[in-house]
């Protein structure tokens, strides 16, 4: 069974990847959609043509990560494509945002991405692809967005190194450094409450 695994699939770029690939990718049997909001995943799955496995998981939670790795071990699919879109960014000066929120950002944007990639790689074959959602923030440190920019620099650097490591196996790695849409309401909603 050939599958596509998408993290952060309940909204944003993750949702968009799922919808676009569902229409245009005919060489896979199933999509595995991962996000915390299971109800949103069900809505998305209902509008897709492919079979969808819904995995309502918090990737910063060790037990939830185990659900993913155990599902892979049990079903032994061929992961044709892994798309890591799960992530978020908190706006605000470093000392103004509580440290727990910032370490949570690092956990999801970096550690979870590493763990999902590590868990999926044994099930990838030649011509499989890994797409990591970085950001244009990876290229430029940003005051007021410092932790987010640092996590995206990590994603970019990790992706470049992994691409070189996997080249002989013909597993392709792409880091997408998108700029995002400028939507003030959305950006404002990510700001720490004291800065809104």
What do these predicted ranges mean?
Residues 10-11:
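Conserved glycine-rich cofactor-binding loop
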Residues 25-43:
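Conserved glycine-rich Rossmann-like NAD(P)H-binding loop of the short-chain dehydrogenase/reductase
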Residues 85-90:
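Conserved NAD(P)H cofactor-binding loop of Rossmann-fold oxidoreductase domains
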Residues 93-94, 98-106:
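Substrate-binding pocket helix/loop in short-chain dehydrogenase/reductase
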Residues 117, 151:
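Active-site helix of classical SDR
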Residues 135:
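Residue(s) in the substrate-gating loop at a strand-loop-helix junction
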Residues 164, 168-196:
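SDR active-site lid
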């Amino acid at each position: 069974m050939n599958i596509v695994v998408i993290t952060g699939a309940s909204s944003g770029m993750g949702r968009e990847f799922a919808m676009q690939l569902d229409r245009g990718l005919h060489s896979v049997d199933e999509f595995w959609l991962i996000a915390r909001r299971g109800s949103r995943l069900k809505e998305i799955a209902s509008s897709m043509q492919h079979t969808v496995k819904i995995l309502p998981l918090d990737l910063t939670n060790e037990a939830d990560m185990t659900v993913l790795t155990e599902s892979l071990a049990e079903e032994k699919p061929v992961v044709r494509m892994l798309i890591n879109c799960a992530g978020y960014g908190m706006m605000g000066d470093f000392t103004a945002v509580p440290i727990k929120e910032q370490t949570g950002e690092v956990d999801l944007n970096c550690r979870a991405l590493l763990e999902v990639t590590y868990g999926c790689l044994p099930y990838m074959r030649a011509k499989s692809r890994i797409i990591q959602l970085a950001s244009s923030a990876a290229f430029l440190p940003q005051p007021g967005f410092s932790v987010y920019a640092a996590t995206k620099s990590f994603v970019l650097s990790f992706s470049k190194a992994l691409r070189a490591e996997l080249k002989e196996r013909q597993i392709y790695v792409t880091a997408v450094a998108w700029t995002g849409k400028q939507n003030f309401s959305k950006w404002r909603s990510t700001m720490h409450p004291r800065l809104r």
